[in-house]
Structures are given as C-alpha cells and as structure tokens.
Amino acid sequence: MSDYKSTLNLPETGFPMRGDLAKREPGMLARWTDDDLYGIIRAAKKGKKTFILHDGPPYANGSIHIGHSVNKILKDIIVKSKGLSGYDSPYVPGWDCHGLPIELKVEQEYGKPGEKFTAAEFRAKCREYAATQVDGQRKDFIRLGVLGDWSHPYLTMDFKTEANIIRALGKIIGNGHLHKGAKPVHWCVDCRSALAEAEVEYYDKTSPSIDVAFQAVDQDALKAKFGVSNVNGPISLVIWTTTPWTLPANRAISIAPDFDYALVQIDGQAVILAKDLVESVMQRIGVTDYTILGTVKGAELELLRFTHPFMGFDVPAILGDHVTLDAGTGAVHTAPGHGPDDYVIGQKYGLETANPVGPDGTYLPGTYPTLDGVNVFKANDIVVALLQEKGALLHVEKMQHSYPCCWRHKTPIIFRATPQWFVSMDQKGLRAQSLKEIKGVQWLPDWGQARIESMVANRPDWCISRQRTWGVPMSLFVHKDTEELHPRTLELMEEVAKRVEVDGIQAWWDLDAKEILGDEADQYVKVPDTLDVWFDSGSTHSSVVDVRPEFAGHAADMYLEGSDQHRGWFMSSLMISTAMKGKAPYRQVLTHGFTVDGQGRKMSKSIGNTVSPQDVMNKLGADILRLWVASTDYTGEMAVSDEILKRAADSYRRIRNTARFLLANLNGFDPAKDMVKPEEMVVLDRWAVGCAKAAQEDILKAYEAYDFHEVVQRLMRFCSVEMGSFYLDIIKDRQYTAKADSVARRSCQTALYHIAEALVRWMAPILSFTADEVWGYLPGEREKYVFTGEWYEGLFGLADSEAMNDAFWDELLKVRGEVNKVIEQARADKKVGGSLEAAVTLYAEPELAAKLTALGDELRFVLLTSGATVADYNDAPADAQQSEVLKGLKVALSKAEGEKCPRCWHYTQDVGKVAEHAEICGRCVSNVAGDGEKRKFA
C-alpha cells in the first residue's frame, strides 16, 4: 500500500500546544525590558491623539495583593486597547510614599524620632524604607505584564514632586481656600494625629448608653412655658449619649425647633423629652407611672438654662436641625470640641470650643479632679459613677454600636478640637464649584456620581494638617503673637519649594527662618505641621501630570481605582484641582469592586481565603490572572478562588488552541505571494472573514465601553462557536487534502491569515504574553511587537445582496446542528462510527431545499458526511427525524456506500477506479496527480 501521508498538507507550527506560562512569561518580560518595549510603543505612537490614564498611587508598604493586581491589570488593558485604537497612551506608574504606616514600620525597627535618631535621620530611614517597598511592588507589577515607564515612575517623595505639592498648597492659599481653626477632627490617640475621612473605618464597639438629667436653673420660667403650676420636684431636660467621657466638654443642649416637647411628671421630679419619644424613654428607664403635664414647641425653650450635672456651670438650650427622633430623648448633648455638628451649631451660638483632652487621649490637668490624666475610654465608668452620685443618672445600659476606628491601629478614635489648618468647603465656594464639576465628569458605573455628590455635599472642611515627622511640610510662617500667616506667604512658599526641589523635604526643617525672612524672623515661627498624605496623592494632577513631558500639558482623561476611592483619591483630587484650577482633574472616573472569595466572603488572612497574585503567576501564569480580571464584571464584587481561576485556565486553553490551529494551517503561506483576492475566494472562507469582522465590531465597541467581560465573552463565542464547532471543522478536509497551491487551499489560508491578524490584536490588551507569542509565529513582514500597531483593517464580509450571504450561512449552521444530532444518535446506536461513515438525506420545504441544493456536491463538506442529498419535505419516510429548530426540515441517515479512501477518509464509489492510484478516490487522484479539485462554496 502506498503512503499518501506525504501528499497531505498537514498542519505544522512551532507554537506550543501548552502555554507553560509560568515558565515562559519571565523570558518574554526580559525581552520586553531589553528591547525597551515601552519606549518602542511611545516612539510608534508619537504625534497621535492622547489618552492619559493617571495612575492612582498605591501605598509603598507591603507586598501587592490581589486587589492591586485587579487595579493594575484593568489599567493596563485600557492603556493597551487605547494604543491599538490609535491613541498615544503613556502610562506612568506612581507610589504614595509619605505618611503614618511607613513611620510606624520605621518606629518598630528604630524607635520614635528623637529617641535613638534625630528627626532628620528618622526621615532618611523612612525614605529608605519606602524606596525598598517601591522596588518590591514594582517587580510584581511588571510580572503582571503591565507596560509602563517603570524606570521613571513618580514617587510622592521625589524632591521635585514634594516641591510641587508645596506649590499646590500655595495656589490654594492664593485662591483663598485655607483657614485655621480649632475644630473637632478625627483623632487617633495611638497615632497622636488627626486622621482623614478615608483613614477611618467602622467597627462594632460596646459603650455605656446613658440618660442624664440637666436641672433647670429657673424652674418657674419653665412652668410658665408649659402653662403648669403643680409640679412635684425639680424640672430637668434629659439628654441621651453613648460617649459619657465627652460630658466635661458639654456647653449646651440642642433641641429641634419644630418638635413637640412634653413635660412629664414621674416619681419625685419632672422631665422634658420629645413628645414622640416619651413612651420609649419611660420603657427604657423603667417608669410605668407617669403623666404628661403639658407640651410646647422646641423653639419655645431656646436659651433657657440648665445646670451641668457635675461641672459647676450652666448651659443653654439651643436649636439645631441635626436633632432627630431616631433614638434618645430628642435633646442632644452638645460638646463643640468633640463633634462636627456640635462645632457648627456652637459657632452659630458663640459657644466655647472646649477641648479638655490631650493628644494621647487623656484628660488635661484641671478638667475635673477624678478625671485629670485618665484615658477617655477608661473615664466612661468614672463619669457614670459621678452622675449616679449627683442624682443625675436616669438610666445606664451597655449598647453595641458602630464606632469610628483608626484604619491602621483598629482602635477607637475620638473627635478632638485641635488647632489645625483646613481647606474650607464654603469660604470661597469650593463645595458649590466641586458639585458643578462632578456633573461634567463621566462616572463609570454611573452610580459613582450620586455617591461622590452626596459626599461632597455633606463633607466638613478638609483638615489638611498633620502632626507627623514623615510628610511634606506645610511650609508656612505665622506671626508669633497674632498667629496670622506672613503677608508674603506665597513668595516664601515658592522659596521653600525651590530648596525642597534640590534637597527634599528636609530642606524645610534645616531652614533657618532668617535665611528667607531676614530681620522679620524674630516675629514669625515656622509651622511644624505636615500635610495629610491625601493632599500628596490628591495633588498629583498638578505635581505630576502637569509637569511630566510625556503628558505634554494634557489633563488626565481617566482615574481608575477601587470603589472606596470616592471618599479617598477621587475626592482629594477633585477638591485640590477645583481649589487650584476651578475644574475637575479628570474626564472619566472608573471604579471597580473589591475581591471576594468563591463564596462571596471578604478576603481575610484570618479566614485563610486570600489568593496571592504571586502564587497564581508562579503556578498558572500572569495571562490566566489577566483573563480572570477581564472575564469578571468589575462593577460589582469580584470573586476569585482556585476553582474560578481553573475556569479561566480552561477558557485560556480554548483561545490558545484556536490560535494554534490558525498558525499550524498557515504553514507554507506567504501573504505577499499566496493571498487570494476576496472575489476569488471560496464563499465559506469569505463568510468566516465576515464573522471575524462582526466579532471585531463587537469587541472594539466593548473595549471602548470598558466592558472587558463582554470582550472575553465575544472572543470565546468566536473561537468556540463560529470557528471551533463550524468553520475550522469544515475546512480541515480542504486544507489537508487539496493541492498545496490550489485556490481552494490558498483561499482557506487567506481567511485564516485575516482571522489570525485580527484575533492576535483582540487578545493583546488582555492576554498580552500569549498575543506576543502568537505574533512571533504569524507569517509575513511585520513590526516586532503587536502593541505598536492598531486594530486589523483587512477584514471584509459578504454583501447582503449575495445569494449566499450571512443569513444563508446562519441557516446552514442550524442545518448542520440538526444533522449532528442525528449522527450523534446513530453513533450512540452503533449504526456509524464517525460522521464520514454516514450519508444523509435532507427532506426540506422548497425555500430551504433551494438553498441546500445551491451548494451542489459541496453540501456534504459542510455537513462532514460522505454523502448528502436534498429531497422534497413531503417525501420524508416515517423514520426521518423532524428538526426542532427548522420546521421545514427532516433528516434521514444511512450508512455511506462505497469504500473508505485512506487519504481523505471519505466513503465513495470511485476508490481504485484509476489504475495508477488504485487505493484512493477520484477526488484525491485529482488533488495528487491532476489539476486539483475546484471548490466554489465550501
């Protein structure tokens, strides 16, 4: 028997079947670095329209976690897809390098500043620590396949950036937004510093819940207000609080002007409460026998005075809109030094902003004999005992409630009035302008807009000063007597900024005021405060984007971070940009959800359900991690587990196998010589290119809308359905058995070439390593990297006016699906082995029959059977299978007649009819020794 294997065009490629990504990716990365791929892309895109995604800086502390990976991969997908869309999209990664977590790490190792090291040496250690953290994180980000200017990232501790942060503050001061005040701010007693909103987390805490009676100073005046004369015992206004330790700072009681307040007689005394809360309060304090003597509106009680239970002074009743009927008594204990609402109303009434608590959370000397020097949280029990002793405690119970805690220490924080510097929200209309700017930004998902609007509408002034060592100095001089800013503040700040640009922030602490103030130095003091780190990162639109040459003066198009950044980086950036420039720093803001495990639980080391990106890359490869990120709808929580990653790996194999099939069948194809013109191609091949064109339209639209899970779904559908289960199956016969240089085969290769050129580009933003690998095996002249080009423009489709248009082939797909069902049943019944052992008769109604007949003898190639005939629907025998999908179709199957050709495996009647090739069929004889078969349709 002759060996006809050598006459077949068998697929061949060096592109490996297995990805072996974990082993292969590091080598590709080394090549990208050696070639300076990022630089090559920048050179290729120079002069094109820009798209700037500004990197929100991760904090330079610790290893990257799965959330970091999600963030950086999403950014990279956008930057790469924009590049393919014809944009110049430079990506400059950044790091947030100042602030408390780094100080704490350095303190753990070296002690607090001033103990073993001077403050200057401590700062140097902080800088050193941050630099090592940046290096560690950078390696992992690069390993993810993220392309960017990793050799020149921006660090908020770069001298130039530190100088520009000072300049940003100068601009805000120049625009009139800064003010100084003793305001209550979130204060961590462990950090001994004010905290930003974004540094506060809420945890459950158990506190004493108490009802306290403040006795009226003028009992008769109150009786008159309520129109009563017979009251048994003293009259008191009752407050409710869960922070007894704040009572020494009480300076008023707030009530609502429009609520009804009742005077209630209980045993031996009368109490004033909101009428709607009388029943619940009586229940709480265990009183069943009570009488309401009278009611008045809250407004009637304004400025009546009540005695503080133990501080020896009296306080007024004042009117406030913040009073609610949700809980308590309808009368709110008001301590302007310990709460923002209290502070605001205190300002209105000219109350003292008392702050009896020191930075370490203990009462200052002279507060109250039994409280001086006591930690405020330990003082709760002392205050309760004191109230009991004075007869002012109506009720006490333990209550669990959500309480603000320090994000770093996880310990409860306090509101504490301290002299601080604030960016005012309303002094110069910053709030109103910010709310206006929000409307001009595209928020993705769109609920982000309402979220940040409500935060901006309700937020207090921003306390930007911190009492820290490792941070950008505020660089201010204030008069030692008046505490007013120096009249030449802006000029002086620029002078400081110039020095910081050369020597870093240490230049401020080394600065002798005389050097820039001259004789005035004796009248002014240097402000020791540093800036909130959110000011550092929030000003990068100015300190980085405005000054980096690759951004060429363009503002950022997009900020992209986790959804917690509405109150973090998105907010601080908006505040600073609006305060500096009157406009938002971004055009689009995209947020992604947090990662959770397969059961939807938050990632936690204690539960042991964390997924380490380093482990995933070392086991499965970065492309699997990238595919998981792209496949997941990032607008909600993003579930990840070993099982979910395994599914991503399965999807990856499908895409890789499709790419490998294309490459293997492009063996020996030179696009410069072998390309077939569209009008000369086999119709099915043109249809396949048209499928790629339709897929590309959907995929590009999804990339444009940042719907990456749609990109992956469409890519998978194209690989699995249109290609895998239809086209790629059908063409194997023609591809392998036709004459190597025939139009029939070259037409097919032309289609595969166009499809591969498009597919490799669709993959590139997501499966960057694999796309680079595929690119290296594609035939034809090309640039070295897929990332320097644009979407493929060589696709074309069938015209609707053609008889065999897309609708024609869509119907054929359905017919083939129905035939496959019949073949599968026959295989299960052991009537046939493979589909080529079958011959089918399609009984079809006239319209469908005409379409099927149009394919002539080539219908069998579409159906992958050795025989296919078309007959009248009404002639179908009883055992023909009625199609469930196409009502006008029945399918009958019989065993194919003739012998099996050992070359093409088809069963035909003409095997051995040609003496010189006695073992093969007539079609194969033509392909081996004759002019070759002609194919028009399939």
Curated annotation (Swiss-Prot):
Primary location group: cytoplasm
GO biological process: isoleucyl-tRNA aminoacylation
Role this protein plays: Catalyzes the attachment of isoleucine to tRNA(Ile). As IleRS can inadvertently accommodate and process structurally similar amino acids such as valine, to avoid such errors it has two additional distinct tRNA(Ile)-dependent editing activities. One activity is designated as 'pretransfer' editing and involves the hydrolysis of activated Val-AMP. The other activity is designated 'posttransfer' editing and involves deacylation of mischarged Val-tRNA(Ile).
Gene: ileS
Motif annotated as 'KMSKS' region, chain positions: 602-606
Homology family: Belongs to the class-I aminoacyl-tRNA synthetase family. IleS type 1 subfamily.
Catalytic reactions of this protein: tRNA(Ile) + L-isoleucine + ATP = L-isoleucyl-tRNA(Ile) + AMP + diphosphate
Gene3D superfamilies, per the entry: 1.10.730.20, HUPs, Valyl/Leucyl/Isoleucyl-tRNA synthetase, editing domain
Listed name of the protein: Isoleucine--tRNA ligase
InterPro entries assigned: aa-tRNA-synth_I_CS (IPR001412), aa-tRNA-synth_Ia (IPR002300), Anticodon_Ile_BEm (IPR033708), Ile-tRNA-ligase (IPR002301), Ile-tRNA-ligase_type1 (IPR023585), Ile-tRNA_ligase (IPR050081), M/V/L/I-tRNA-synth_anticd-bd (IPR013155), Rossmann-like_a/b/a_fold (IPR014729)
